[in-house]
């Protein structure tokens, strides 16, 4: 009886130790999850570079009114990327590389091109920068987005970033709600 209890405790402890490893192995086995993680990382890196460029090159030239409007816009629950002009990867690289980032990736984790947007002409524009991935299916859903997370296993969701934050991002729903 004691041996059986000890064996049960040992097996229970081992399963608790191996469970996170099995979860990581399952994660590694999912090419879509890896592609999504790489895409989020790329967007975060390029977005951070764009943000540093903005802080150094654009923000000092903005009017107080433009700063106030941008602050108000940052609290919006919806955004429309059409308000920011598209810029080519090459033109963006000419602005950011090598000072702010080593390179601008051409494609997301699924091999689809990123879309880059940057307003280089009007320092008083309310929205200045954006970039996005179309997700696994390679098709952008729209330019208008509600600011919120999406189920991380929905790999076809667009992943847009704008003016310093993710507009849509993969995140598991909170439990208990």
Describe the residue ranges of each PLM region.
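Bacterial N-terminal signal peptides
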Residues: 8-20
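Sec/Tat signal peptide C-region and signal peptidase I cleavage site
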Residues: 21-25
């Amino acid at each position: 009886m004691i041996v059986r209890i000890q064996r049960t405790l040992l097996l229970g402890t081992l399963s608790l130790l191996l469970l996170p490893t099995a979860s990581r192995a399952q994660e590694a086995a999912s090419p879509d999850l890896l592609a999504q993680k790489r895409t989020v990382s790329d967007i975060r890196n390029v977005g951070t570079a764009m943000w540093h460029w903005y802080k150094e090159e654009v923000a000092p030239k903005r009017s107080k009114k433009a700063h106030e409007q941008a602050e108000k816009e940052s609290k919006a629950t919806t955004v429309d990327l059409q308000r920011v002009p598209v810029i080519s990867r090459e033109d963006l690289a000419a602005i950011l590389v090598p000072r702010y980032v080593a390179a601008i990736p051409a494609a997301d984790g699924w091999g689809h091109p990123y879309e880059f947007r940057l307003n280089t002409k009007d320092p008083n524009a309310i929205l200045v920068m954006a970039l996005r991935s179309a997700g696994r299916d390679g098709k952008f859903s729209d330019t208008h987005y509600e600011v919120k997370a999406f189920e991380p296993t929905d790999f076809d969701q667009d992943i847009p970033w704008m003016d310093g934050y993710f507009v849509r991002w993969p995140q598991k729903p909170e439990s208990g709600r």
